[in-house]
């Protein structure tokens, strides 16, 4: 078996585990309401059903409970989330970037929160690096879960350096990686990659974002 074949097989195992363990999103609107106080843009993980995915749903639910009576619009990034990692993430970046910039243009007083899980974290990384610098002033917080950053993830990417969060966003980002998660560490526990809701990390990230919304300029 060649190394490329091995990477492909293990990648399918990871994606299948995500699809089986992660609950599909339900009932969440795909597009943010015009000029809500807060706009959340979230990208789901590989092979999760269209919508926010379970991590995104839990993050938004927790954030909603922490921001008082402020209105929250939610946008689920529209992209394949397929195992054609590089092309799929690039497609997601295009969709996320376009939506974020439309929000900034139409609703300049809306505070934006970005989030992504697994491949979705790469989508947000690519988006923040591609958008005009002025957009960063409208983004209050970024929450990343299981961001692909391991050697294994690099192989799935096709080699070379993996995307990282844009420099203008790094100080407003919480980047959470479960212990032994093979996607964001050198670990070997695939189940760790689907533990972000149960571990309480989505609530941790929501608290970070809520504090940023309350205190950041």
From Swiss-Prot:
Its EC number is 3.1.1.-. Optimum temperature is 37 degrees Celsius. Keywords: Disulfide bond, Hydrolase, Secreted, Serine esterase, Signal, Virulence. Almost completely inhibited by paraoxon. Inhibited by tetrahydrolipstatin (THL), a specific lipase inhibitor. It comes from the Bacteria. It catalyses: a fatty acid ester + H2O = an aliphatic alcohol + a fatty acid + H(+); a butanoate ester + H2O = an aliphatic alcohol + butanoate + H(+); pentanoate ester + H2O = pentanoate + an aliphatic alcohol + H(+); a hexanoate ester + H2O = an aliphatic alcohol + hexanoate + H(+). Residues 1-32 form the signal peptide. The keyword Cell membrane does not apply. It is found in: Secreted. Belongs to the cutinase family. This is Carboxylesterase Culp1. It comes from Mycobacterium tuberculosis (strain ATCC 25618 / H37Rv).
């Amino acid at each position: 078996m060649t190394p490329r074949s091995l990477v492909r097989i293990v990648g399918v195992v990871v994606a299948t585990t995500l699809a089986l363990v992660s609950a599909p999103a339900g009932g969440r609107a795909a597009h943010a309401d015009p000029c809500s106080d807060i706009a959340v843009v979230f990208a789901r993980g590989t092979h999760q059903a269209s919508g926010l995915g379970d991590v995104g749903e839990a993050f938004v639910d927790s954030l909603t409970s922490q921001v008082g009576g402020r209105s929250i619009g939610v946008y689920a990034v529209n992209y394949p989330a397929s195992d054609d990692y590089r092309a799929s993430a690039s497609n997601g970046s295009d969709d996320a970037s376009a939506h974020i910039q439309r929000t900034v243009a139409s609703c300049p007083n809306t505070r934006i929160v970005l989030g992504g899980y697994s491949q979705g974290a790469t989508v947000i990384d690519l988006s923040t690096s591609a958008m005009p610098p002025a957009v960063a002033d409208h983004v209050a917080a970024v929450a990343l879960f299981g961001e692909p950053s391991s050697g294994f993830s690099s192989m799935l990417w096709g080699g070379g350096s993996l995307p990282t969060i844009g420099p203008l966003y790094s100080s407003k980002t919480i980047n959470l990686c479960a212990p032994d998660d093979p996607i964001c560490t050198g670990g070997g526990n695939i189940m760790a990659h689907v533990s972000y809701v149960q571990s309480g990390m989505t609530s941790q990230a929501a608290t970070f974002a809520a504090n940023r919304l309350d205190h950041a300029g």
